[in-house]
Every structure is written in structure tokens, then in C-alpha cells.
Amino acid sequence: MIPAMVVPVLARHDLLDRMIMSINYPVKDLLIINNGARDYDYVPVWNQWIAKIWHLRIPSNLGVASSWNLGIKCLPNSDWWLISNFDVEWGGDSLKMFDELSNPNKLLLSNGAPSWCAFSIGWKVVDKVGLFDEALHPAYFEDNDYERRCKEAGIDVSDSFIPLAHDNSSTLKAGFQAKNNQTFENNANYYQNKINNKDYSSGVWSIRRRRQNSWD
């Protein structure tokens, strides 16, 4: 059984429903972090493979890193978390493979495009490396930063052959491309500064940076 699945969403909730309906393996807790709740009156579809669906309606966009962190904080007793994009489709034995290959000491990436469209992260990884850097708001470079920090900490970052169908950049195509054009460079510069300064910290969220990089 998948102990915890965390799925943030901002737009295209129809693709989230498609993802939920594609689940074909037992999931204990599915946590949906609905960053588009102000604009969409959404109710998740039912799937018999999921023991419990938790739907958090967020009044503004937390962004990727903050959403992933919130998922971990909401289900802190899980041995590991499967974090997934909303626009993937599960099929075959992909979820079973994640269950069999994941453990508390590992960061396991999918074979989707990109590989971070679904990944599992163990509690001992979070304990050693920390949470994702919420200064990288709302999207991009949070995965690069975390993988870099894991490697510095000697954590096993494992590629896999776990297949996954993924409609890449669904959020940007839903009307956020222009805003991303503004924030992408800000995040690229922030990430490069961390590299230049050999900064392996989890960063610091700030209200000024949050407002500057707003997609709201």
C-alpha cells in the first residue's frame, strides 16, 4: 500500500480527476492541495483503491515547494511520501513498483518526463536534508535544488524504470505562461546564487519574494 500520496493542483482539475481515476493500487491517504480553490468549485472523484481522500482548499497559490512541504507536514508519520503531478496517469504496475522500491532512506524518481513528475521521498531523507526551499516560488528549480542538497548529504537519489504518462506543463498551458516568463528568471538567479555560495540550506520563505513571484 502507498502510505501517502501528495498531489498539488492549480488549474485543469479535470486532469486531476483523470489521475485519481487511473490509480489502480491501494493508497492509504491521498492529500490534494488545491491551490486553485478560489477559482474552481471542485470535488474529487471517488476511487475504490483510495482509503481516504483529504482535500485542502487553499485561498492562494502556495507554489510547488510549499505544497510539497505541506503534504509532508500534514502526514508526518508516513515512512515515505509519493509526490505526484496532477497531470500524470498511472497504469500497469507503476504504483506497485513505487511501493516495492521506496523506503525511508531513499529519494526515488520516476521514469516519466521529467522524472520529477512523480517521486517518493523517505522520512529519513527529510530528517537529514530538510524540506524543499520555499523561496523558489511558485515553480521551477525546487527539484534541482533538492537533488543537489541530497547528493551533498550523501543521500541515495535513485533513477528508476517506473513508467508514467505525463502531460507536461499543463499548468502553464492553462494560462500561466506569461507569469512564468517573469518568475522563471528570478528563480534561476536565486538557485545559481545558492550554487555559487555553496548554500545547501532549505532556504527562507519571505513575504517580499512571495509577492514578487506571485501567480495569483
Q: Where do the protein language model's features map onto the residues?
A:
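Conserved donor-nucleotide/metal-binding helix-loop-beta segment in metal-dependent transferases, i.e.
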Residues: 93-110
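C-terminal catalytic/acceptor-binding lobe
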Residues: 142-216
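Short, well-formed alpha-helical segments that are part of the catalytic scaffolds
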Residues: 11-25
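A conserved acidic beta->alpha catalytic loop
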Residues: 33-43, 87-89
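Short beta-strand/loop segment that forms part of the nucleotide-sugar
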Residues: 28-37, 56-58
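Short beta-strand-to-loop acidic/aromatic patch adjacent to the donor-nucleotide binding site
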Residues: 78-89
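Glycine-rich, basic loop-to-helix element that forms the pyrophosphate-binding segment
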Residues: 58-75
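A recurrent flexible, glycine/aromatic-enriched loop bordering the glycosyltransferase active site
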Residues: 106-124, 128, 138-139
